[in-house]
């Protein structure tokens, strides 16, 4: 097996430090808990239902998305490089009686033995935390079956995104620990779609996510100016 090093140790350490609160709906990962129903619905709707399908969740962390997909019948493999988040994910799956295969590995290394294996691959809120996003995108493309779906979510790179996700969410509203995000690692939709296209993933849909701090509610929006998701299909 090849060795792949598309990992930022500082990013891994950052999320390992917060792992103990991963499943606290009022803790540091509250935004992910509130956002997850929108992510799950989008994935399930666009993919034509994930019940009974082989799904790979790249950058699964403590398993919020992985577990929700398994609960609606997907056969889920969760992939991450953080020991503590994976331990939390495995323990919570046992507590809730959900079967999920959690694996410590990079997307690139996992690809070596899993080419064309998955019906659906998800890579949510992960690309902005790795040194080489294009390498992860290519690995995701290699692991999905022809005609299968790969979903990505990340944050746009512009002034508004900086104000809302860093100044607003981290410093003002204290929704996230300071230092969670680096604006320089954010990815414009045009850049993400171009990288996906180079990996032979056709962008079939895109949607934005907006947050109202007054109502504490996330909702879909046509605007991709800040948080957004794209759905891509592997060319046959």
Swiss-Prot record:
Keywords: Methyltransferase, S-adenosyl-L-methionine, Transferase, Ubiquinone biosynthesis. GO terms for molecular function: 2-polyprenyl-6-hydroxyphenol methylase activity; 3-demethylubiquinol 3-O-methyltransferase activity; polyprenyldihydroxybenzoate methyltransferase activity. S-adenosyl-L-methionine binds at residues 39, 59, 80, 124. HAMAP family: UbiG (MF_00472). Pathway: Cofactor biosynthesis; ubiquinone biosynthesis. It holds the Pfam family Methyltransf_23. CDD domains: AdoMet_MTases (cd02440). The lineage of its organism: Bacteria, Pseudomonadati, Pseudomonadota, Gammaproteobacteria, Alteromonadales. Belongs to the methyltransferase superfamily. UbiG/COQ3 family. This is Ubiquinone biosynthesis O-methyltransferase. It comes from Shewanella halifaxensis (strain HAW-EB4). The gene is ubiG.
């Amino acid at each position: 097996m090849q060795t792949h090093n598309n990992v930022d140790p500082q990013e891994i350490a950052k999320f390992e430090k917060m792992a103990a609160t991963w499943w606290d709906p009022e803790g540091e990962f509250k935004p992910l808990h509130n956002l997850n129903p929108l992510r799950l619905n989008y994935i399930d709707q666009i993919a034509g239902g994930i019940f009974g399908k082989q799904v790979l969740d790249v950058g699964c962390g403590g398993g919020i998305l992985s577990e929700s997909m398994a609960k609606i019948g997907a056969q889920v493999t969760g992939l991450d490089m953080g020991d503590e988040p994976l331990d939390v994910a495995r323990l919570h799956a046992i507590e809730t009686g959900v079967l999920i295969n959690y694996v410590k590995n990079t997307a690139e290394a996992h690809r070596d033995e899993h080419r064309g294996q998955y019906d659906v691959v998800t890579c949510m809120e992960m690309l902005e935390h790795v040194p080489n996003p294009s390498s992860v995108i290519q690995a995701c493309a290699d692991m999905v079956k022809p005609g299968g779906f790969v979903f990505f979510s990340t944050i746009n790179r512009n002034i508004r995104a900086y104000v809302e996700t860093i100044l607003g969410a981290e410093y003002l509203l204290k929704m996230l620990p300071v230092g969670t995000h680096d604006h320089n690692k954010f990815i414009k939709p045009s850049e993400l779609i171009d990288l996906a296209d180079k990996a032979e993933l056709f962008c079939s849909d895109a949607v934005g996510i907006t947050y109202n701090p007054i109502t504490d509610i996330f909702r879909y929006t046509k605007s991709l100016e800040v948080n957004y998701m794209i759905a891509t299909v592997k060319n046959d």
